[in-house]
A protein has these predicted regions:
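N-terminal regions that are enriched for targeting/export leaders
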Residues: 1-47
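Domain-scale recognition of functional cores that engage charged ligands
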Residues: 14, 43-397, 406-417, 422-423, ...
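Short low-complexity stretches enriched in small and charged residues
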Residues: 29-37, 153-159, 239-242, 454-460
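Primarily single-stranded nucleic-acid-binding OB-fold modules
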Residues: 348-389, 398-403, 413-419, 425-528
Length: 528
């Protein structure tokens, strides 16, 4: 790798960004070397890695969660990544507005414009700007592009530059709701402890903070009255120190018109920094666009409570075992055996020596033979004393994508991981077969515990696999560039968490990736 010659201005800019020179040079090395593929043991399934709960187990989990919420000291929080702009939702409409053809998806929007929750606002914008001509009148007169212009640009609703959080998603008799309002409604149903306060944290782009707070100032009190809850809402932005340097095709830093280095956001994995700074005992993580109207929320609410109950059960067991393993000289062999079984059965964590030599017997027998009891206990404590996450997984009925896998690490241990397609070695026939035959996908439905058995918050950066991530190819002013994406939030950023996968039904996953998704029946449900 050719050494980069930094100018004084470069070093000043790097420092102002909150990044060290060594970190930037490490990023340049990653562009040169790429990222290694993980060693996949198998795709997680019902037999290995994914819990399919029985009716009794679901009932017990619900009872556990209800009991947890009755604890006045419990702090529950919903963490919602919401920094993405809604522009991707309207990609086809942008193309149409700029002169493209009315594709099938565009025509559906024009034909069913009245079915959108934002129609009344759009109609008013059209009438104001077009001398009393409403949206439907303009569409019928062949002026669909005019209507779309009022939808997407500063002339009207500005939806092309707003975040998804502020887009009106669903109709209600009193007034429509945005995506963020649906998260508030949802939180009141499963994340409200006995105190009555629902804590939510949204990550946003800096330019969206003000309109976000403006919306809350208008709507929060009404929602508190509707759901008999008090909302404590906080926000944060992605830290500049998590940005990554951009390079050209030759892997050398590129510069802007003023000769300055170019840094780009490092992807949602950078939000591990934001997650580290929230204080909560239990944290629910869910994407901003996966919400439904109240009449369709029951399955989501029940399974959020179930996942929360499973997490509390796992957390309580882990805390108890950590207490019993504190004194390496006094921990019993039954506790050692129970810990090993707990790690294997709950998190698919196999200890290297046991995994590689099963014929030699269980860990306890090995300890007796090798006289290394204290060393093994330290290993068990290291594996046990980690953040915990319970992740809902949905059966895969379409094309494979990001999903659950059992992975073997360099030290020989195994664990459960969520891998994206870009992390899969598609050139390896066996790995590609496992990818193609995977039965579940990741809907981003997590419940997390980020505190240790003493009640201290973990340093989440200690549990990131920095060898993960990927390189994306972009362009700037028509010139190609390469960008470095940090380990994804629920991928490499949580690689060394203890992970449990639980099957959840498909009706808990209803994301809005395009504006047309809002026309699907689940998002058009009539509210009484």
């Amino acid at each position: 790798m050719q050494e980069t010659q930094w100018t004084e201005e470069d070093l000043r800019q790097i420092s102002d960004q909150g990044i060290t020179r060594s970190e930037v040079e490490h990023q340049l090395e990653l562009f040169e070397e790429g990222f290694p593929f993980p060693t996949i043991v198998q795709a997680a399934d019902e037999e290995h890695g994914i819990r399919v709960l029985t009716e009794e187990e679901r009932r017990e989990a619900l009872e556990t969660w209800a009991s947890a919420l009755s604890d006045p000291s419990l702090r529950v929080l919903k963490f919602v990544p919401a920094s993405g702009a809604a522009s991707r939702m309207f990609r086809d409409l942008f193309a149409y507005m700029e002169g493209g053809e009315a594709t099938e998806s565009v025509q559906q929007v024009l034909d069913r414009m009245e079915d959108f929750a934002f129609y009344d606002d759009l109609n008013k914008a059209c009438m104001l700007g077009e001398r009393g001509k409403g949206a439907r009148r303009l569409i019928d007169a062949g002026e669909g592009r005019t209507v779309i212009r009022y939808l997407l640009t500063e002339e009207g609703l500005r939806y092309g530059s707003l975040p998804k959080a502020l887009i009106l998603f669903h109709k209600y008799p009193d007034r429509p709701r945005t995506a963020v309002e649906e998260h508030l409604a949802e939180g009141a149903k499963y994340a409200r402890p006995v105190s009555g306060t629902v804590h939510l944290h949204f990550t946003l782009s800096p330019e969206h903070i003000h309109p976000f707070k403006t919306l809350l100032s208008r709507r929060q009190e009404d929602l508190e009255d509707t759901f008999s809850a008090e909302y404590d809402i906080t926000t944060s932005t992605q830290k500049p120190s998590t940005d990554t340097i951009a390079v050209g095709p030759d892997n050398r830093p590129i510069r802007d018109e003023e000769g300055r280095l170019i840094f780009r956001p490092g992807g949602h994995g950078s939000l591990i920094e934001n997650l580290s700074e929230v204080d909560a005992d239990i944290i629910f993580i869910k994407n901003i666009d996966n919400v439904v109207p109240d009449s369709e929320k029951s399955s989501t609410i029940i399974y959020k409570q179930i996942l929360g109950g499973v997490l509390v059960q796992l957390r309580d067991t882990a805390y108890r075992l950590m207490e019993e393993l504190r004194d390496e000289t006094r921990a019993s062999e039954s506790t050692i055996r129970e810990t090993e079984d707990f790690l294997r059965q709950s998190f698919c964590v196999e200890i290297a020596s046991h995994t590689e030599s099963p014929e030699e017997g269980d860990v306890v027998a090995e300890l007796e033979r090798s006289q290394k009891k204290e060393s093994i206990i330290r290993t068990l404590r290291t594996l046990l004393n980690r953040p915990i996450r319970v992740c809902g997984m949905v059966r895969n009925e379409g094309e494979p994508g990001g999903g659950p896998y059992i992975v073997r690490h360099e030290d020989g241990t195994t664990s459960l991981q969520i891998l994206e397609s870009s992390q899969i070695d598609h050139e390896d026939p066996e790995t590609e077969r496992m990818f193609r035959e995977s039965r579940f996908f990741n809907p981003v439905d997590l419940v997390c515990c980020t505190k240790d058995f003493r009640g201290n918050t973990f340093d989440l950066n200690r549990f990131v696999d920095k060898s993960t991530g990927f390189i994306s190819h972009k362009s700037r002013n028509g010139q190609p560039l390469k960008a470095l994406e940090r380990p994804g939030l629920w991928n490499g950023a949580m690689a060394y968490w203890n992970t449990c996968f639980v099957e959840v039904p498909a009706d808990t996953f209803n994301p809005v990736k395009t504006v047309n998704d809002l026309l699907r029946p689940v998002h058009q449900a009539e509210e009484e």
